[in-house]
Amino acid sequence: MELNIFFRSVLEQDTAPIVLCDLEHTIVYLNSAAAKRYEYAGGAALVGTSLMNCHNSHSKELVEKCLAWFAADEKNNIVHESYNPKENKDVYIVALRDQEKKLTGYYEKHEYRTRDTGEFYKFT
């Protein structure tokens, strides 16, 4: 079975927004959570547009610095972008690399820190 089916499912099942971009900052994929979160800016229609359209000049500069750092060494793969106290989450920019470790793009990773208080193994 083709692994891409599994990888896409992992991305789609994640409840955190995932936005994948190529090296030209083109949004190549949004998972369902990202499409919903960024609905105010176009949601799923953002695929194919530039991530830079959504950022101010300072943010654009920081994204470019991240990409330069990623490109400088194959071991440079994650940058802590911000902490959002309202949502109790950290946001990271993560390098995407091919099998030869060549930089191919990046994505924004949201890690929520609020404990899930739901019942374990509750099948509803």
For each feature predicted by the language model, list its residue ranges.
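Sensory modules in modular signal-transduction proteins
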Residues: M1-A35
